[in-house]
Swiss-Prot record:
The keyword Isomerase does not apply. This is Chaperone protein DnaK. Acts as a chaperone. Residues 598-612 have a biased composition (Low complexity). The modification Phosphothreonine is found at residue 197. GO terms for molecular function: ATP binding; ATP-dependent protein folding chaperone; unfolded protein binding. Pfam families: HSP70. Signal peptide: none annotated. Keywords: ATP-binding, Chaperone, Nucleotide-binding, Phosphoprotein, Stress response. Residues 613-626 have a biased composition (Acidic residues). Belongs to the heat shock protein 70 family. Induction: By stress conditions e.g. heat shock. The keyword Cytoplasm does not apply. The gene is dnaK.
Amino acid sequence: MGKIIGIDLGTTNSCVSVMEGQEAVVIPNAEGKRTTPSIIAFVEGGEIKVGDPAKRQAVTNPTKTVASIKRFMGHSFSETTDEAKRVPYSVVKGDNNTPRVDIDGRLYTAQELSAMTLQKMKKTAEDYLGQTVTEAVITVPAYFNDAQRQATKEAGEIAGLKVMRIINEPTAAALAYGLDKKGIDQKIAVYDLGGGTFDISILELGDGVFEVLSTNGDTHLGGDDFDQTIIDWLADEFKAEEGIDLRLDPMSLQRIKEAAEKAKIELSSSAETEINLPYVTATASGPKHLVKKLTRAKFEQLSDTLVKRSMEPVAKALKDAGLTVKDIDEVILVGGSTRMPRIADEVEKFFGKKASKGVNPDEVVAIGAAIQGGVLSGDVKDVLLLDVTPLSLGIETMGGVMTILIESNTTIPTKKSQIFSTAADSQPTVELHVLQGARAMAVDNKTIGRFNLDGIPPAPRGVPQIEVAFDIDANGIIKVSATDKGTGKSHDIRIEASSGLTSEEIERMKKDAEANAGADKIARERVEKINEADSLIFQTETQLKELGDKITDEHKTAIEYALTELRMAHQSQDLEAIQKGLDNVNAAWKTATEAMYAQGEQGQAAQPQAETQGDDVQDVEFEEVK
């Protein structure tokens, strides 16, 4: 059995880990970094860049550089209109009311784009392990609904991965934190503020059992929102001074987005930072520059409502777990955004204790996912993970009410059924409107599926008995069935299409992803070949100068002729001509060096002979004849 890797698919950054013996190891990417920006760029020539290479060119290519795509995962287009206004790339309405990113007329789903990041993680792991990777545990925010979980699973499939388990991020963090503390019974709170989402989970740890008692969160609260407060402040200040809204120009927007993120990070360790963006825009009167000082106090004032917003789910999760702050033994901060001093201060103030510093907030989730992979493969023993469903599940009943079958924070996997009946006399069909959420009315909750149970025999209202059953697996993915108890006729659906993609679309995207991987390989090989030519041209020019008169004029002419051909091929970037040029230069060098060494050997052979003749000369006495 191959290795099951653990992937933290983040809004801002992603991370991959794998079990090596009894230790989870975070794997550095090709750029040598332990986390990879969740950024995808489409550049000229059809090449797709992922991670740091994509991030580096974002300012000059803002409309074709996609970041924070996780915020669109599993949502309908109508749910993401506000998000779409905040990004420099174009988000349009696609099939099944799904949001799609428009890149030169080609519409990409959030799943396809996330799959590109997952492919990068997969390749990173394969390069490290020296073997093909096909299985993964992927993390999601605890408060992700069914559609968002399905979308994540689909992204994994498109990337060529069999998703062995979808695991909640705070649970993964707790697993990483508590693996070496199996003998200690304790209750922990995991406060997870990432780039785009926020979760709070309360867990009980003991004897290798990790039991989630409750979870809560906000899937629209993260580091991006803190950045946005700085973006809006900068843009509003500049507009007041210059009368220009920088948010309307994609390139200017990208520049202030990057500056805002940098300022936020700097303010975690400094009391003040300067934002300096020369030539941020231009008017008829000339270029305009943006120079502003931002203090930590001002930033905390700008983001105050966001910090307070994060504490509401914390209080609710604690209440749902039936605990008070005094019952919590450890507080763990997860996610890069928890490095903001105000966050740590607020959390520590709420719980009345210092947060644990024993975990790396950027890596702990991926490590936990790798440990879960180890549990599934049998490499990690004596660990049991008991997670919960984050949102209540039910169906719409008379009057547009949501009738709950499975309450939020129920341990999964689980199954629950309830008997319902018809609302009208001789009703032949029952439509089941499956919902997920926490509101009383159906209209206020998330629709995750609809299906009909047909063929109900004519009967007065309230007589037929329809058993509705909900089944949630360990991934938090739902199956719903309805059975007419009188006839035994039943119908069930696995809520597969709640993300808006059909199985055919997923298969097509999977093939596209494989084709892209092939195209990326060709593009990489092309660059490598051009670089090889560039290197050989430089080496040849250097060696011709160094060797000088040691090479005959005839051989020097042959090398220079081949070198000229290679230079022309390098300029044209014709790979076939480059390969021919490389072969010709190498062949000319081979002939020249063979002749050079042969000449050297002849010289060495003549030298011993002369030395031998000298050794045979002896001194003799002679008499001068007069």
